[in-house]
Amino acid sequence: MALWGGRFQGETSALFKLFNDSLPVDYRLFEQDVVGSIAWADAIASVGIITATECSDLKKALNELLVEVKGDPAIILASGAEDIHSFVESALIAKVGDLGKKLHTGRSRNDQVATDLKLWCQSEGAALVARLQTLRSELIALAEREFDAVMPGYTHLQRAQPVTFGHWCLAYVEMIERDLSRLTDALKRANTCPLGSGALAGTAYQMDRHALAAALNFASPTLNSLDSVSDRDHVVELCSTASISMIHLSRMAEDLIFFNSGEAGFISLSDEVTSGSSLMPQKKNPDALELIRGKTGRVYGSLVGILTTMKALPLAYNKDMQEDKEGLFDVVDSWAICLDMAALVLSGLVVNRPNALLAAQQGYANATELADYLVSKGMPFREAHHVVGVAVVAAIAKKIPLEGFTLAEFKTFADIIEDDVYPNLTIEACLAKRDVLGGTALTQVKQAISAKKIV
């Protein structure tokens, strides 16, 4: 039976029921709905709506229902209820009779679902924090393992300057830490309890909403009933935080896909996270990484969806908000599996050091070192930049690295070049000179890893 049938004389269209019912989506809020209902039973008992005995009976029945559904989750969808709130109330009435009809006194589905959803976000958010921390740990472990593995760094996907694989890992540690900061910050803002806000104007019963919030482990109650039932900022923020994090996961996936390619060959991926071709026996495809990259667009789509749904809604609750959950649930599911998969990829990754080093030695990645050398001899940097550019063109024509020039050939570009130029052009020198906070020098990478391990 619908929770709102008294006002209506005609039958609901089967098509409308299919269109209107949200149980196929919001069944995931079952546990939160029961927990919220238990707290609400205490709240209405505190203002004399039900007796202590009735409160105890309601809470016992709700806890029994919780156990039953956990044992057989299929009974929710088999019920044909309109939504998760209707399912819980109907199941409760089946257990305790008319007493179950008292539970909704002073409560609306508007503040009920707002509370359920915030409880769900808090629970799932905590799990996502743990996943981000696991990925961070995997990156730090990989950075420590491969801190001195030399590889080319890129700009515009062109070889630019040599870096280490450890330094590359630490770049993504920084991104993951920002994701963690954003997520924990968003969860703090979502840590307020809407229950007691009623449909929009507040409940008519003078209960202690601070106690109600505390019972549900919220930091505090919300302060405006109109905002409480119509606020979905926590949904938007969770989707936004996920989207930004998925940018980072997608970029990492793209880097690793390239590093794993035959053209680069810097890394090898574990068989655990790769698959083959139905036609080409030699293929070992980085499917896990490609799916991370692919799911990023899916997460973005859900963010745009909730932003668009909420953009022009008048206060307070509107049925449009029923569309908040499907996208949110999919975002959280997608983000969670991508975080888990990224961690698994990293745990089995092997760096092919000779290939990565060879690539770093090619492409004139030491050109900046030659320019810096000329500056150390007194040449203005802009002039040095031009001279080295000319030298690179000549080296390309001769098919030699910069260090392949004889001293006499070097002097045709600048008389101030001496024999001491050659030690400055080695990979080791290129790395060692970047001995500044945040740089790729081995000393800096070691210090950065040590600092990250302490946190």
Curated annotation (Swiss-Prot):
Enumerate the catalysed reactions: 2-(N(omega)-L-arginino)succinate = fumarate + L-arginine
InterPro entries associated with the record: Arg_succ_lyase_C (IPR029419), Argininosuccinate_lyase (IPR009049), Fumarase/histidase_N (IPR024083), Fumarate_lyase_CS (IPR020557), Fumarate_lyase_fam (IPR000362), Fumarate_lyase_N (IPR022761), L-Aspartase-like (IPR008948)
Question: What Gene Ontology cellular component terms go with this record?
Answer: cytosol
Look up the domain of life of the source: Bacteria
Q: Which organism's genome codes for this protein?
A: Shewanella sp. (strain ANA-3)
Q: What is its EC number?
A: 4.3.2.1
Supply the name of the protein.
Argininosuccinate lyase
Q: Which residues form a coiled coil?
A: none
Q: What is its main location?
A: cytoplasm
Q: In which pathway does it act?
A: Amino-acid biosynthesis; L-arginine biosynthesis; L-arginine from L-ornithine and carbamoyl phosphate: step 3/3
